[in-house]
């Protein structure tokens, strides 16, 4: 069983840098390529609890999908936002690193050090 799970996009420099930090610390890492295998809305809610954040905190507001889906609408519920992110994983901020019941966003990549 892995000590850490990283929701990783290999095309993202911050995601690669975060994974490099984990590897240098000799951490056992499960890599989830979340663009290929997006988390369900329920899994996203669990991640948010571990992050101590709400859905709006992890939505990439600069993505075209954010504008096209009108996600700026403040009347959308957490469940609705999680469903949109699950269906459009490009909207999920990256990387997210989980260890046990805690998680961080690797922006900056050094944030992951707080999990050690």
Regions found by a protein language model. Name each.
Residues 16-19, 23, 67, 113:
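Class I S-adenosyl-L-methionine
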Residues 1-3, 92-93:
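A structure-centric signal for secondary-structure junctions around beta-strands
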Residues 2-21, 29-34:
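Local sequence-structure signature of Cys/Sec-based thiol-disulfide redox active-site neighborhoods
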Residues 36-116:
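Thiol/selenol-based redox catalytic cores and closely related redox-interacting motifs
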Residues 26:
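Short glycine-rich hinge loops at helix-strand junctions in the catalytic core
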